[in-house]
Amino acid sequence: KCMDVTRKEACMSIDEGFDQVESLKRYTSLGMGPCQGKSCHEAVARLAAMDTGLTASDAVPTTMRPPAFPVSFGLLSGRAHHLGPIRRTPMHHCHIDLGVKFLDAGAWKRPDSYMDPQQEALYVRKGVAMIDVSTLGKIELSGPDVIEFMHFMLPGKFAKLDVGRTRYAIMIGEDGILFEDGTISQIEKGKYYISTTTGNQDAIYTLFQWWLTTGDYDVQVKNLSAGISGVNITGPKVREFLSSIIDLDFSNEAFPYMHNRQATLEGVPLNLFRIGFTGELGYEIHFPSEFGESLWNYFMEKGESFGLKPFGVETQRILRLEKGHLIPGADTDALSNPYEAGVGFAIKDDKEDFIGKAFLAEFKQREIENRLVPYRLQEGDTIPIDGVAVIAEGKPVGRVTSSRMSPTLGYGIGMAWVPAGSSEAGNHF
C-alpha cells in the first residue's frame, strides 16, 4: 500500500483510463505519502508495469521528492547575481547620472544619497530639493460603498473628507497593532487616492481585495503603484519654484496644508499633494510613470536657477526625525499599539465595527506603560546605534528605534521607547 491505495484500486484506475503513469499517480496518490516515493517507488513501478504492459523502466512514476532528495536553489546558476528580482523607478538612470548611491528597499533600488546626507538636509532646510518617491504605493478606491468600506478597513473617519482634501491615516491589524501610515485624498468626487509606504503597498492592496470578498461592498480597487510615479519637492523656495513652471496658485490661502490639487505641466497630468514628511514646506507631485524620466530632468533643469538639488532616503530619515515623525516597522514592532506610538488621534472609535476595534478598546482601557517619544542628545554625544537600550539609574528601561545627527540643530536626535511615566519633555536618560 501507499497512501492506503491497494493493488485493486490501482487496477481499477487503469481500467478507467488512467493508464499513463503520471496520471495514475495523481489520480490514486501513489507515491505521495510521507516518504514521497522513497519506500514505495520501486514497488509502484513494478505494479504499474504489470498492469499496463510497460517495462518497469518505462513505468517509473517520477523521481523521489523532498525530503528524500531535497534540491537546493543554490544549484541554479548565478542565483545571487542573476535571480534576485530588482525594481527600478522610471528615474533610475537619472539618479545614476547624478552619481547616486543606491539603497535596497525590498526589491526596489532607491536613491540613498547623492552627496553627504548632512549637506543634502541643509539644502532642504535652506533652499529647495527633490526626492524620488515613485516607490510609494498608490491605491484608488471608488464605488457606492467606498466610505463604508474605508470605515471598516481603517480606524479613522472619511465621510467629511471633501474633494481636494488630504488626511493622515493609519492602518491596524485585527489585533489592534499599528502596521502602516499614509494619506488618503479625495481627488475627484467619489474617488479616493491612498498613498502607502513602499514596503506595504502590495500587502495593503491584497488586504483590500481579500476583505472585499468577505463583505457585501460595491467598491472598485485599483493598484496604480506601477503606473504612477512621483517626486517630493520641498524647502523654503519650493513655492517660488513651482509657481514659475506650473499654472497653479500655490499660495497658502489657495493651496493649504493637507490639501490636493490637479494641474498639467507641458501637457502631463499632475496630482499635487501638500504634505510635510520632511517638516518643511513641500509638495508631492504624482504623474504617469512614462513621463518620470523626462519630468525629473525638466524639474532639475528649471530648478537650477533656484538651487534645486536632489536628496535621498538617508536625508529623508534625518529630516523626518527633525520633525518627529515615526515610521511604522522601524519605530514600532509587533507589540506597538497606536496609543503608545502617539498616533491615537487618527482613531475614531465612535463608529460601527472596524478592523481591530475590540483590541483598541482593550488598549484604551489599559494604563499606557510605554510611549514612543522623540529625544535629543547633548552636543558632542555619540550617536547611538538603532536598537540600543535606554538606561535610567543603571537599568535598561527602553530602546532607541532611530537616531541620526541633525545638521540643522547641531546635535543628535532620534526616537525611543521609554516608560510612560518618564515620557514628558525634559526627562533625562
Task: Report the location of each language-model feature.
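Short glycine-/aliphatic-rich beta-strand segments at the starts of folded cytosolic domains
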Residues: A129-P155, L224-I246, E367-L377
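Acidic, proline/glycine-enriched N-terminal capping motif
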Residues: L24, D51-I172, I177-F179
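Glycine-rich, small/acidic residue-mixed loop/short-helix segments
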Residues: S336, E340-F429
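Glycine-rich phosphate/pyrophosphate-binding beta-alpha loops
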Residues: S29-G37, F277-T278, T401-L409, I413
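Glycine-rich, acidic
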Residues: W211-L212, D216-K364, I368
